[in-house]
């Protein structure tokens, strides 16, 4: 069993977002990846991306808008995004949103313009 304590988890700061890697192949999980995503108020993804696996978003605090239709998801809610669905995420409230994300290990991401970006560093 692998325990990942918050202070030891790798953190990736991007404009308007913080990804904190939890479970992944390099952190003891062969089949699944999870990370915590913090979204600053007013943030909106500049472009959509798609993934080759289903992705699950569980909103722990705040609220977000997600997907091609910018569907709202509030604290305590979850969204299951099927593989191949264009994903955009944005803050939907006045405060910071916190989300736990889960997906199969080894997934690959493709940006809206067709650029393949593979697996991001918080999920390896």
Residue ranges, per PLM feature:
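Asparagine-centered strand-capping/turn motif at beta-strand->loop junctions
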Residues: 89-92
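Glycine-centered loop/turn positions within well-structured domains
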Residues: 54, 71, 87
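A short, N-terminal "cap"/entry segment at the start of jelly-roll beta-barrel domains
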Residues: 1-31, 115-124
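Short acidic-glycine-tyrosine-enriched beta hairpin
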Residues: 69-84
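A short hydrophobic beta-strand segment most commonly corresponding to one strand
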Residues: 34-36, 56, 80, 94-111
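Glycine- and acidic-residue-biased ligand/ion/polar-headgroup-sensing regions
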Residues: 52-64
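Short, charged/polar surface micro-motifs in flexible loops or helix N-caps
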Residues: 27-31, 39-44, 63, 105-108
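Conserved short histidine dyad/triad with adjacent acidic residue
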Residues: 20, 33-51
């Amino acid at each position: 069993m692998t325990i990942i304590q918050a202070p030891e988890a790798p953190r990736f700061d991007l404009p308007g977002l913080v990804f904190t890697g939890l479970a992944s192949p390099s952190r003891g999980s062969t089949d699944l990846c999870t990370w915590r995503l913090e979204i600053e108020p007013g943030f909106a993804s500049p472009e959509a991306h798609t993934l080759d696996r289903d992705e699950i978003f569980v909103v722990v605090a705040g609220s977000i808008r997600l997907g091609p239709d910018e569907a709202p998801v509030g604290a305590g809610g979850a969204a299951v995004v099927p593989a191949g669905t264009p994903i955009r995420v944005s803050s939907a409230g006045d405060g910071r949103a916190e989300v736990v994300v889960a997906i199969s290990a080894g997934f690959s991401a493709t940006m809206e313009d067709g650029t393949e970006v593979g697996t991001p560093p918080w999920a390896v």
